[in-house]
Amino acid sequence: MNSTIWLALALVLVLEGLGPMLYPKAWKKMISAMTNLPDNILRRFGGGLVVAGVVVYYMLRKTIG
């Protein structure tokens, strides 16, 4: 279980690093556009990502475990 968490974290880091590595200009543009969004929109977006991550986690946990 402990190694699974580290593997998941490593995958997140790889996926998060692909944007700035492959498309730095587009990544900067996206980040600057996000700073102009209202806080409630950012909270909804973040909450949606958390919910999606939890759903995928439980789906994979039932399938694999």
Swiss-Prot record:
Domain of life of the organism encoding this protein: Bacteria
Pfam families named in the record: DUF2065
Keyword Nucleotide-binding: no
InterPro entries recorded: DUF2065
Segments traversing the membrane: 4-24, 45-65
Membrane topology label: Multi-pass membrane protein
Alphabetical keyword list: Cell membrane, Membrane, Transmembrane, Transmembrane helix
Localization terms from the record: Cell membrane
GO cellular component: plasma membrane
Entry keyword annotation includes Chloroplast: no
Protein name as it appears in the record: Uncharacterized protein YjeT
Naturally occurring in which organism (per UniProt): Escherichia coli (strain K12)
Name of the coding gene: yjeT
